[in-house]
UniProtKB/Swiss-Prot annotation:
Keyword NAD in annotation: no
Name assigned to this protein: UDP-N-acetylglucosamine--N-acetylmuramyl-(pentapeptide) pyrophosphoryl-undecaprenol N-acetylglucosamine transferase
Known catalytic reactions: di-trans,octa-cis-undecaprenyl diphospho-N-acetyl-alpha-D-muramoyl-L-alanyl-D-glutamyl-meso-2,6-diaminopimeloyl-D-alanyl-D-alanine + UDP-N-acetyl-alpha-D-glucosamine = di-trans,octa-cis-undecaprenyl diphospho-[N-acetyl-alpha-D-glucosaminyl-(1->4)]-N-acetyl-alpha-D-muramoyl-L-alanyl-D-glutamyl-meso-2,6-diaminopimeloyl-D-alanyl-D-alanine + UDP + H(+)
Organism: Anaeromyxobacter dehalogenans (strain 2CP-C)
Subcellular location: Cell inner membrane
EC number: 2.4.1.227
Coiled-coil stretches: none
Membrane topology: Peripheral membrane protein
UniProt superkingdom: Bacteria
Length: 383
């Protein structure tokens, strides 16, 4: 089976696509996956680093661009559809999965017109504009939150969760080693780390009596690292401060409480590794979807949510203290998070995709082609 994964822009779209691709290629040596995205998106660097080929099209978003910006970006669509058609003709995928982001629109629509089975994977509680539009033509809509189902026809919805990359999953499932002092993990994700960094430093004076009894790992991003380190030192704390955490699975395994944003991929990781959390949704997220994402964990008893407009150092310190000082509450929150986890999401989504392929092509392996056959890239593909 050959799968094409279209879309990207941010890690929240790209990483679930990579997780699905990893599941597909490990199932059978003849399976392969190709991605389609844009040169400006995170996928342009992350996908090749993960070992998958990627094709690039030229397309820009319409939402939030203003009238003139939207009209200018609309002019790119005919070219994007032509590029998508060329890519689909060359790669001959058996199924195309859109993972959100504006790059997925032309590819999935062109695949639908070519009678190739199509699906979308929606990571958030509120479906993005592109996925909402594509939902009218695709065969399946894979969702992670019950709230997202309302954007798609009921017969198309498969609520299976967000896929998590295989290497991370293997580490999450390792038994934890025993430890003593409570451990706190803080990170802001790819967007919106600054405000969270500032409020954590403001919280430290209110946690001064815990500085000898708490271990902190804090991912700051490049902009704030020096300021955050100085803030910790001024209050007598000795944390592990990093610009970027390379191995998030180890960071999760080594903590008792997480303070973070409420992106869909982050929440999928928190639930699979069963970690209590204090969630501060990114207020600029499209359609305020991070608040809706966070609410699903809060309602289940797995997390506490503080909206950024209400976030102060004192409020954050109080929530951290209340949870770290209550081992039984942490355990209840951990169990609640685990009940929301979807460790089999990638496998189950791949199962449905293979069934779509079987229905269309008469075999779960798709169209007849030479084993391992991949098209050569023409020099004018992006032109």
């Amino acid at each position: 089976m050959r799968m094409m994964v279209a879309g990207g822009g941010t890690g929240g779209h790209v990483f679930p696509g990579i997780a699905l691709a990893e599941e597909v290629v490990t199932r059978h040596p003849a399976n392969d996956v190709v991605f389609v995205g844009t040169a400006r998106g995170l996928e342009a660097s992350v996908v090749p680093a993960a070992g998958f080929p990627i094709e690039l099209i030229e397309v820009k978003g319409l939402k939030g661009k203003g009238l003139v910006g939207a009209l200018l970006n609309l002019l790119l669509l005919p070219r994007a559809f032509l590029q998508s058609w060329r890519i689909l003709r060359r790669w001959r995928p058996d199924v195309v999965v859109g993972v959100g982001g504006y790059a997925s629109g032309p590819v999935v629509l062109t695949a639908w017109a070519m009678r190739i089975p199509t699906a979308v994977q929606e990571q958030n509680a509120i479906a993005g504009l592109t996925n909402r539009l594509l939902g009218r033509v695709v065969k399946a809509a894979f969702t992670a939150f019950p709230e997202a189902a309302r954007h798609f026809a009921p017969r198309k919805v498969y609520q299976l969760g967000n896929p998590i990359r295989r290497r991370l999953m293997e580490n999450y499932m390792r038994p934890e080693s025993a430890h003593g002092a409570p451990r706190l993990l803080v990170f802001g994700g790819s967007q919106g780390a600054h405000a969270l960094n500032m409020r954590v430093i403001e919280a430290l004076p209110h946690l001064a009596d815990l500085r000898e009894r708490i271990q902190i790992t804090h991912q700051t991003g490049a902009r704030d690292r020096e300021y955050v380190e100085k803030g910790y030192r001024a209050c007598g704390f000795t944390p592990d401060v990093r610009e970027f955490i390379d191995d998030m699975s180890a960071a999760y395994a080594g903590c008792d409480l997480v303070v973070c944003r409420a992106g869909a991929t982050t929440l999928a990781e928190l639930t699979v590794c069963k970690k209590p959390s204090i969630l501060v949704p990114f207020p600029a997220a499209a359609d305020n979807h991070q608040v809706k994402n966070a609410r699903s964990l809060v309602d289940a008893g797995a997390a506490v949510m503080i909206e950024e407009r209400d976030l102060t150092g004192e409020v954050l310190a109080r929530e951290i203290r209340d949870i770290l000082d209550a081992p039984e509450r942490r355990e209840r929150m951990a169990r609640a998070a685990g009940r929301l986890g979807s460790p089999q999401a990638a496998k189950e989504i791949a199962d449905v995709c293979m069934e779509l392929v079987r229905r269309r092509w008469g075999s779960p392996f798709g169209q007849a082609r030479e084993p391992g056959q991949k098209p050569a890239r023409p020099p004018d593909l992006a032109s």
